[in-house]
């Protein structure tokens, strides 16, 4: 019988809702025997989160991932030693100490997954400004994890309603994103997406490339990127034997993906894919980082400083991230073989 996956959960920015949704998700999923949770962070912060959410869970400081078993009303925490006193962190504001705590949590959880002590990492939201206050220059989780794992060429993959959504560009202005739509980029992103689809269980994946312009450019009347860049890239991938279609108008491509015409969609810029996924299922959208030698899933929302500390945040996205991680844990051997720098094909 396969062993139950041990999933490491980061506490996120302790000034935000990360600790709250973490403890609530663990509480709500206590009867879910498909995974065992372990939190990386500060016990004082996790205890405070239990208090503001009205939970009576015992927060247990542990020093090792060994012999962790599911236990009712107990949250096991590997102490990263950054915030010994919860009142050092003020709810709902950008603080350097909170940034340092978030980084320490990510580093500890990543190290545990890399060494095989856990089967995956599930990340709570962080605040980029707090991270930058520490002197870090990472744009976010994905870049930090890529650096820690030695695999900087990662790919964000949203899992929503059975569809996998990829991004050719992400954290840049819309103007920069449009200027970035070049043949070399699209060729590269198509192959990365196809590779990820195979790693995550699609043996013969069908990928759609979203169009950039209205009506896929309407024969060049509304833009020429489809003619000059996207269509040639799709044609080249097909010539290599891949099942790639497009460019498909963006107002229909995601719907077609949900009804299983495609396994994945390559969106061209941040909001093109985000708007689609969050409209399809706001609480059920889960971010997966493909290209890492570890399994990493994440909630797809921010720290919500405006409601932090009130016990008002919904844990549904964290529960979705845990559910996807427990399901995808079966792919961990393939993930390591494919993406580990010393053995993979990066």
From Swiss-Prot:
> Which cofactors must be present for this protein to function?
a divalent metal cation
GO molecular-function term, one example from the UniProt record: metal ion binding
Swiss-Prot/TrEMBL keywords: Carbohydrate metabolism, Metal-binding, NAD, Oxidoreductase
Q: Which residues bind substrate?
A: 141-142, 278, 296
Q: What superkingdom heads the lineage?
A: Bacteria
Q: Which major enzyme category is it? A: oxidoreductase
E.C. no: 1.1.1.408
Positions bound to a divalent metal cation = 171, 215, 270
Which reaction does this chain catalyze? 4-O-phospho-D-threonate + NAD(+) = dihydroxyacetone phosphate + CO2 + NADH
> What does this protein's record comment on cofactor binding?
Binds 1 divalent metal cation per subunit.
Q: Pfam families, alphabetically?
A: PdxA
Task: Report if keyword Transmembrane is assigned.
Answer: no
InterPro entries in the record: PdxA_fam
Q: Which SUPFAM superfamilies match?
A: Isocitrate/Isopropylmalate dehydrogenase-like
Function summary: Catalyzes the NAD-dependent oxidation and subsequent decarboxylation of D-threonate 4-phosphate to produce dihydroxyacetone phosphate (DHAP).
Q: What does the subunit section of this Swiss-Prot or TrEMBL entry state?
A: Homodimer.
Which family would the database say this protein is a member of?
Belongs to the PdxA family. PdxA2 subfamily.
Its name, as the record gives it, is Putative D-threonate 4-phosphate dehydrogenase
